[in-house]
């Protein structure tokens, strides 16, 4: 398990709701006239999501202005706009809205006596991997999983890239996961 939790936290719900609010603020989203509706809201929602996936250090590393004397910093802003457009070109706002809504429903303990009881039933060999800079699923969430899954091991990787570290820290993840394959 990596960069996840057994149930949605209030922190995660707040991020998801902020994205839905951006979608709902777009008048074309509310009109429901076409799948292109809500495109401006989708771009904004994506920008909000990106900030939640990344970290302060990661943005400073990748989005700092090349010109230290620039009057108006825009590299990070341009990146946010680019990522919003990129998503809007391949995804529709209505699907994004319900995908964000579905995240709020995550709770493996529902109907199973709570998360601790549900986790206690896991019999598979389990390694839980936390990312030290992940703000969406902080390491305390990963440690909770490892503490309640019988025989689970906890490993932590270091990343400057927040939650997206699970996509970017390939060497560290390989070091943790590869031994499981043998």
Q: Residue spans of the language-model regions?
A:
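Feature representing long, continuous alpha-helical segments
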Residues: 94-101, 175
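Conserved alpha/beta-hydrolase "acid-adjacent" motif
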Residues: 135-141
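Short, conserved loop/helix-junction motifs that constitute active-site signature segments
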Residues: 119-123, 148-149
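Short beta-strand/loop motif that positions the catalytic acidic residue
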Residues: 122, 128-130
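Active-site nucleophile elbow and catalytic-triad environment of alpha/beta-hydrolase enzymes
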Residues: 82-83, 98-118
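Catalytic active-site module of serine/aspartate enzymes centered on a nucleophile-bearing elbow/loop
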Residues: 143-144, 151-182
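Alpha/beta-hydrolase-fold enzymes
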Residues: 3-86
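Residue-level signal for short, function-critical loop segments
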Residues: 5, 132-134
């Amino acid at each position: 398990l990596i960069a996840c939790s057994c149930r949605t936290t209030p922190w995660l719900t707040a991020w998801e709701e902020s994205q839905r609010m951006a979608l709902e603020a777009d008048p074309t989203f509310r009109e429901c006239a076409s799948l292109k509706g809500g495109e401006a809201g989708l771009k904004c929602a994506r920008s909000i999501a990106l900030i939640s996936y990344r970290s302060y250090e990661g943005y400073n590393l990748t989005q700092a202005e090349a010109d230290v004397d620039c009057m108006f910093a825009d590299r990070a802003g341009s990146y946010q706009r680019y990522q919003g457009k990129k998503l809007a070109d391949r995804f529709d706002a209505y699907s994004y809205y319900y995908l964000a809504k579905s995240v709020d429903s995550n709770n493996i303990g529902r109907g199973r006596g709570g998360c601790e009881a549900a986790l206690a039933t896991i019999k598979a060999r389990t390694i839980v991997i936390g990312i030290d800079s992940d703000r969406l699923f902080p390491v305390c969430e990963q440690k909770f999983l490892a503490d309640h899954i019988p025989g689970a091991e906890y490993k932590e990787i270091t990343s400057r890239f927040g939650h997206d570290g699970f996509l970017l820290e390939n060497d560290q993840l390989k070091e943790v996961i590869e031994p499981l394959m043998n």
